[in-house]
Amino acid sequence: MKQQIQLRRREVDETADLPAELPPLLRRLYASRGVRSAQELERSVKGMLPWQQLSGVEKAVEILYNAFREGTRIIVVGDFDADGATSTALSVLAMRSLGCSNIDYLVPNRFEDGYGLSPEVVDQAHARGAQLIVTVDNGISSHAGVEHARSLGIPVIVTDHHLPGETLPAAEAIINPNLRDCNFPSKSLAGVGVAFYLMLALRTFLRDQGWFDERGIAIPNLAELLDLVALGTVADVVPLDANNRILTWQGMSRIRAGKCRPGIKALLEVANRDAQKLAASDLGFALGPRLNAAGRLDDMSVGVALLLCDNIGEARVLANELDALNQTRKEIEQGMQVEALTLWEKLERSRDTLPGGLAMYHPEWHQGVVGILASRIKERFHRPVIAFAPAGDGTLKGSGRSIQGLHMRDALERLDTLYPGMILKFGGHAMAAGLSLEEDKFELFQQRFGELVTEWLDPSLLQGEVVSDGPLSPAEMTMEVAQLLRDAGPWGQMFPEPLFDGHFRLLQQRLVGERHLKVMVEPVGGGPLLDGIAFNVDTALWPDNGVREVQLAYKLDINEFRGNRSLQIIIDNIWPI
């Protein structure tokens, strides 16, 4: 197949006013990621944006204060992903520490209840005695659920970060940084971030009302919950803007110091990660998937129970359960990828005539795993993808993943406007969204989605590209620089881990495992010998003993094994020269 991936180097903003004492490499990396001042590199909690800028907070805390005083039964309604689980656990733990004793939580089941505060979920909350519902990481599109709650006399506070539609649910209070009238500077808070800010505001209000003094309660340190904020923020793949970097760094610092929930400690253990050397990528690729596995295959209540439990023994039992679910998820995903191969082969043959956006469906696909499958197909074909699975009653549930240049939720909203009734419901963000439609509408949707994306997207964006930070000099290929880069994060969505490119002599190459290429390389212009590994290579192409020189896109890394540390490179892309 013709090489579709192009290499592009990041542009560096030469006008960025960064501290002169920063190493030149870091100044270059930060400036190319939109950092323009030292203030944006702040990591202390003092640098956090103030909660006072979130609209709706004052009304929400007043409702919660009255509920606390009157002993009102509060039910927190979460979501079935890692952000929803951490949001739920954080809200319950925070309100307990603030002096609320009559609180419980409910997490919708993906397969039985669907997403959000539906009327059915409201009925479940009502059956459990709910007198006030607080949604976390959902609710902004739950018009019917909020109306049903009102009909039962249950007020609702919505806390969410998903993009709102044209109309808002009739909740008593809504907190969402993406509301049109909200002046909160960061629009990238995860659901757990929104919940954390509400709890900060509530603590201040309770203190000002004399709540803690009246009851002899010590004012809680809510920073103890930042481990949950970090996990939910990274796992939900929201942009790591300056404010989210503070939240994530502070949470990671607590985890590294061993000051985290037993559930997070147990997840680190089953994932074989060293807490003291935690990177943001460990939250995203090791802990997040295990927590998400509960919501994908079973019930996220298991994940919330893990995050709430105070006993490390109990936490280990639950973490092992999640680890087993994650392994099952991997097996299901692998099976779905095998089923998708036939579709992929057809797509490969017709790549030149592929629509801009791909919609795919198989009657045996699992609705808890279609999002991951969509990500895999998107990476392969470099275009927006929505994968569908049967949801029963003649309907399909789809999960979409987009690329830079196409706002997935906006695209679905446009389709819903152009073709009323084709989509049953939808919601999401720029890069990921979910929707439902009737099975007999799939082919129509497939056609219309492909046409819309083709119309909206510049064809150049459909060519995969690797965005590099340029070359490293031989003098920068050291353990010290690798450690500097490790400490310079947290790296993540929209603030990517540094990726470099260069021209190397290929001195050794061999497969390890089934699909991993182990190499030794040397910069063509001279420099250190470097061990490297490329994961999941095309074994039809590699190893190739006829190749003597290669272009690499790589990350500088430290390999730690049995107490020994050595420099290595992690190869993202390898091109023969």
Locations of regions flagged by a protein language model:
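A short acidic, amphipathic alpha-helical/loop segment
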Residues: 144-148, 373, 480
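Hydrophobic helix-and-loop "lid/oligomerization" segment in the mid-to-C-terminal part
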Residues: 2, 8-132, 152-153, 204-441, ...
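Mid-to-C-terminal polyanion-binding domains and interfaces
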Residues: 69-70, 314-320, 324-360, 393, ...
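Acidic-glycine-rich active-site phosphate/pyrophosphate-binding loop
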Residues: 66, 166-176, 264, 521-528
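Short alpha-helical basic/polar micro-motif
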Residues: 193, 371, 375, 552
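Histidine-centered active-site/metal-ligand motif
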Residues: 161-162, 366, 429, 516
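Alpha-helical scaffold elements adjacent to nucleotide-binding pockets in ATP/GTP-utilizing enzyme cores
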Residues: 91, 121, 148, 194-201, ...
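Active-site cavity-forming subdomains of large catalytic enzyme subunits
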Residues: 123-192, 196-216
